[in-house]
């Protein structure tokens, strides 16, 4: 996985020596909670949660200020999702990171996002502070999403309320 994590360094910092690249890879693995001695293994030798940490290390090795995360917790069991969310929170706090977080999992969005945009068919239907949207969704679509995510009884989208 060393080559995978170091790939961005080859592109963005090509003057780094091999030993400097390796040091950055080791630091990135430590940062995401993986033992650096594992860096000589292949991706298929890692669990889903470890692979997600490797993906995060690929970004962190470049010392970013902004990270785009597309479904970073999908296909992970609940305990591993919680670990990844905790890692992302810690990295955000430690490095003052801004995230663009794309997810269908509203529980994870609620855990991480300060601001939120709800989209339907490629169009924005609601946006604002996450706490406000979760507390008082304005559109029927957002209400239905919240109900589905949090198992709340609600009328179907498009139903007429009395």
Model-derived regions: residue spans:
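Conserved ABC ATPase "signature" region
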Residues: 19-37, 146-147
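Conserved ABC ATPase signature
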Residues: 42-46, 50
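Hydrophobic anchor residue at the start of the ABC signature
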Residues: 56, 84
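Conserved catalytic motifs of ABC-family nucleotide-binding domains
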Residues: 63
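A short, surface-exposed alpha-helical micro-motif characterized by mixed small hydrophobic
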Residues: 109-111
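ABC ATPase "signature
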Residues: 127-128
């Amino acid at each position: 996985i060393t080559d995978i994590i170091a790939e961005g360094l080859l592109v963005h910092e090509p003057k780094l020596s091999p030993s400097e690249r390796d040091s950055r890879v080791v630091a990135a693995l430590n940062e995401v909670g993986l033992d650096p001695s594992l860096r000589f293994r292949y991706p298929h030798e890692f669990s889903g949660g470890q692979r997600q940490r490797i993906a995060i290390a690929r970004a962190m090795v470049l010392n970013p200020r902004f990270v785009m995360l597309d479904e970073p917790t999908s296909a992970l069991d609940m305990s591993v999702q919680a670990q990844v969310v905790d890692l992302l929170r810690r990295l955000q706090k430690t490095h003052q990171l801004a995230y663009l977080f794309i997810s269908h999992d509203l529980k994870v969005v609620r855990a991480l996002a300060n601001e939120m945009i709800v989209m339907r068919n490629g169009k924005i239907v609601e946006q604002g502070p996450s706490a406000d949207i979760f507390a008082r969704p304005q559109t029927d679509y957002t209400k239905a999403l919240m109900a589905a995510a949090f198992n709340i009884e609600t009328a179907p989208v498009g139903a007429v309320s009395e």
